[in-house]
């Protein structure tokens, strides 16, 4: 069964990207790899993209150090090798990344359950 096309507008790159959800997941280069996202010395995550649509993250530093959660994500090509990746965590936290695999950079916007927004950017490094 083919998933209907998604249209994802983005002001970040100044154009709209169109792709089917199935095509986006298949083209996503992170599947089968592990990355570290370094937002600051106190905010570092290991992102293990175990399979298309599933990722386990581990907090490696800061107040959430040691937290591990497996989430179901959606990856949408913005301008490959840049992808918008988003998911909802068990506590209701909503996370959106723009991951640029060509530049090794990641931007994140996080909406916490209490209504607070967190905006970070940093290095995205493949470790496996």
Could you say what each language-model-derived stretch is?
Residues 7-16:
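Bacterial N-terminal signal peptides
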Residues 1-4:
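Positively charged n-region of N-terminal signal peptides that target proteins for export
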Residues 29-36, 52-56, 79-85, 105-107:
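Short, hydrophobic/aromatic-rich segments at coil-to-beta transitions
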Residues 24-45:
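Tryptophan-anchored aromatic micro-motifs
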Residues 44-74:
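N-terminal glycine/threonine-rich, aromatic-flanked beta-hairpin/loop signature
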Residues 17-23:
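Sec/Tat signal peptide C-region and signal peptidase I cleavage site
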Residues 63-99:
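Contiguous, well-ordered beta-strand patches that form the walls/edges
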Residues 84-128:
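Beta-sheet ligand-binding and adhesion/scaffold domains
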């Amino acid at each position: 069964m083919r998933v209907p096309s998604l249209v994802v507008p983005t002001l970040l790159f100044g154009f709209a990207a169109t792709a089917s959800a199935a095509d986006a997941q298949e083209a996503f280069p992170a599947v089968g790899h592990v990355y570290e996202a370094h937002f600051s010395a106190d905010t570092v995550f290991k992102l293990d993209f175990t399979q298309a649509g599933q990722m386990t993250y581990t907090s490696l530093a800061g107040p959430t150090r040691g937290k591990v959660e497996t989430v179901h994500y959606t990856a949408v090509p913005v301008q490959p090798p840049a992808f918008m990746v988003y998911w909802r965590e068990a506590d209701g936290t909503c996370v959106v990344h723009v991951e640029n695999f060509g530049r090794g950079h990641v931007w994140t916007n996080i909406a916490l359950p209490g209504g607070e927004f967190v905006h970070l950017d940093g290095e995205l490094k493949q470790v496996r």
